[in-house]
A protein has these predicted regions:
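Extracytosolic and intramembrane catalytic regions of membrane-associated proteins
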Residues: 192-193, 204-374
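N-terminal membrane-targeting hydrophobic helices
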Residues: 1-198
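A short catalytic or substrate-binding loop motif that flags glycine-/basic-rich loops and adjacent residues
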Residues: 199-203
């Protein structure tokens, strides 16, 4: 979820309280506390760290009390002895923990995936109920904050909207998934891993992704749906990344392992020549491949046109690899494909690892484990 929505949700939560510290800092501090978990980006310097840290430990349920404590210490005006109607420190701590939980809620209902079980698991929770930027969620919150004076009932309604609207999206997602499965089953198609994603203006537009086995291999299909779950455009087809290949690459590289855990139904295509390594590896039969997933697109033509206008518009999250048959490299008989070089590039944030040698996964140190690094 975008930071404006996070901050607005915190402001609404504070304004909905019947009693709050009588300081002009009360609402801004609540807004900042609700947006604060995204400060994990401050500690990111490489694409791999972006995948491991963003929506990572600062979004973890286990770390929530600690982050809440740090935020409570920063919210000194709320528990300062000279503040009229001040709260005790424990109450401020409870508030900041609630703001962190509110942030986590608004992230898990999107499609990105949030690692709420760190440091015990890197599993990403995604409920696929709300598009990553949803004006139907954000604008009512901003309007309520603007009209807040002596309107606590309005604030309570806005706070309820923070939960009711995303929860409704999650329910609609489940309904659309059941509709799509029934339709494809009636067409006698061999599909698996069907996933419904919210599109822009998601109560009215959705996207369905699924894998389909065909004689020429496994494909990933994508189709835009209307509010009634009916297809509104022809399917688009992409070559699925073979699971055996992704597993082999994951065993050979912590970068590949992390990327494929992040993706949803990854697809594969030959790499564009301009993105290939400048210096050849010299290995016979080497080939360059691009992996990505389809979560961050849209089935709406006007939305795609808007997305194409953003600076450095491209596939948002890309894994490029140079691979060769294992027999082309002596002593590499344990895998069908040998990973020679790799590159992570995230176009929107302009993060690029450039071509580098893979690093084999290893058990993390205690410090790395605690913060979710590998």
């Amino acid at each position: 979820m975008d930071p404006i929505t996070h901050a607005a949700s915190g402001a609404v939560a504070m304004l909905a309280l019947s009693r709050r510290p009588l300081t002009r800092w009360a609402v801004p501090l609540a807004a900042l506390a609700a947006a604060s978990p995204d400060l994990d980006l401050v500690f990111v310097s490489t694409p791999l760290q972006f995948l491991l840290l963003h929506r990572g430990i600062t979004h973890s349920l286990a770390a929530m009390p600690i982050l809440g404590l740090l935020l409570a210490l920063c919210c000194y005006p709320l528990w300062r002895s000279t503040t009229p109607g001040r709260w005790n420190f424990g109450k401020v701590w409870l508030l900041t923990c609630a703001m962190v939980l509110l942030h986590i809620w608004l992230d898990v209902v999107t499609t990105y995936g949030t690692m709420i079980f760190l440091p015990f698991s890197h599993e990403r929770v995604r409920l696929n109920g709300v598009f990553i930027i949803d004006l139907l969620l954000t604008l009512p919150l901003l309007w309520a904050v603007w009209r807040w004076r002596r309107k606590r009932g309005l604030m309570l309604l806005a706070l309820a909207w923070v939960f009711v609207y995303p929860a409704t999206g999650v329910g609609l997602n489940a309904w659309h998934a059941a509709q799509a499965e029934a339709r494809l089953r009636a067409e006698n198609r061999q599909v698996s891993h069907l996933t419904v994603l919210p599109d822009a203006f998601s109560p009215f537009f959705w996207r369905v992704l699924f894998e389909e086995q065909r004689p020429d291999g496994m494909l990933v299909r994508e189709q835009s749906l209307n509010a009634l779950g009916r297809p509104r455009a022809p399917e688009t087809t992409h070559q699925a990344a073979p699971s055996r290949l992704t597993e082999e690459l994951s065993r050979q590289s912590v970068t590949c392992e992390t990327f494929f855990q992040f993706t949803l139904l990854p697809v594969m295509t030959p790499l564009r020549p301009e993105d290939a390594p400048k210096a050849p590896s010299g290995v016979q039969d080497a080939q360059n491949l691009l992996f990505y997933d389809l979560r961050f697109g849209s089935g709406l033509a006007f939305v795609r046109k808007i997305m194409a206008l953003r600076p450095h518009a491209d596939i948002p999250f890309q894994l490029m690899v140079e691979v060769a048959p294992a027999q082309a490299q002596s002593g590499a008989e344990t895998a069908d494909m040998l990973l020679l070089r790799q590159r992570l590039r995230f176009s929107d944030s302009r993060r690029d690892s450039h071509w580098q040698l893979p690093r084999v996964p290893r058990p993390p140190s205690l410090a790395e484990w605690l913060v979710g690094l590998r």
